Amino acid sequence: MIERDNGTKRHIPVLLEPVLAGLAPLSGATVIDGTFGAGGYTRALLNAGANVTALDRDPHAIREGKPLVDQFFPRLRLVQTEFSQLDRVIEEKVDAVILDIGVSSMQLDEAERGFSFQKDGPLDMRMAQTGLSASDVVNHLKIDDLIQIFRILGEERHSSRIAKMIEKRRRIRPFLRTRDLAHEIEVLIGRKPGDRIHPATRVFQALRIYVNDELNELTRGLFAAERVLKAGGRLGVVSFHSLEDRIVKKFFSFCSGNRKGSRYLPEVESAPATFFPLFKGGKTASEEELQKNPRARSARLRIGIRTQVDAMEADMKLFGLKEIANFESNK
């Protein structure tokens, strides 16, 4: 959400009040904001008296954040890196870590970044602006790979039909623009009057997650946060769709001592908890916030409190992401 402050635009992140309450006390605390974005959480943390190291892999976010660094120097440090590297950019243990997963409002609102089909732009979606773009994926990956991407990362039930349409169309003309791809999907799947969700939404989600390796980045970031937090420190994670939230929920459940087996990970002996939940389940936006910011509708906040137990060894299999991890390694 964007609010105006003295005539200037200022980003207000989702679930801000429960995030600040859940990470308190913040005065004098050392906090890592692993997903700086437009700086909404970082600014609020600084205003609450915290010392913040903010990370973002997007060079545009880093450039835009320089005035905030100047304003709050020396209490703010801004670093261009993935949040999975957060335990490598700060030496001391910290009091809190906040992660706001997925694409930022700033990225969605800039058509030239190619994250959204609400405005036409190049089919890009790269947060770090390096590596494969969404256009590269759509125009060059095998049809079976596209089906997997749409089915697993987008939970798209029409994945096969959409992938076959893409393969047929790209032989004639490549997909280079966001609205071109969205339009072709809408023509294929159809859209009834009053449908709230555009038929291309899940495909765009899947492409963005794949291009930026978001689920693997999240799993690595959770373990990194566990390593860097001091006893009593708090890890807050805001997620926006079921894939992300299942990973976060599984992580906190496992770290709390609930270590039931799965088809990916055999049942293991119980071990001392490295986290315990601040509250049961996840917090969602209030009706008041939803009226101001409809984007908060799918947001869910989970917070864990770090114990004195040593961090466990990172094991990606506990998330049940074996299929996704193996598939993504073939990019």
Curated annotation (Swiss-Prot):
Its main location: cytoplasm. It is found in: Cytoplasm. It catalyses: cytidine(1402) in 16S rRNA + S-adenosyl-L-methionine = N(4)-methylcytidine(1402) in 16S rRNA + S-adenosyl-L-homocysteine + H(+). S-adenosyl-L-methionine binds at G39, G40, Y41, D56, F83, D100, Q107. GO terms for cellular component: cytoplasm. InterPro entries: RsmH (IPR002903), SAM-dep_MeTrfase_MraW_recog (IPR023397), SAM-dependent_MTases_sf (IPR029063). Its EC number is 2.1.1.199. Gene3D superfamilies: Putative methyltransferase TM0872, insert domain, Vaccinia Virus protein VP39. GO terms for molecular function: rRNA (cytosine-N4-)-methyltransferase activity. The keyword rRNA processing applies. The keyword rRNA processing applies. Keywords: Cytoplasm, Methyltransferase, rRNA processing, S-adenosyl-L-methionine, Transferase. One of its GO terms (biological process) is rRNA base methylation. Specifically methylates the N4 position of cytidine in position 1402 (C1402) of 16S rRNA. Belongs to the methyltransferase superfamily. RsmH family. This is Ribosomal RNA small subunit methyltransferase H.
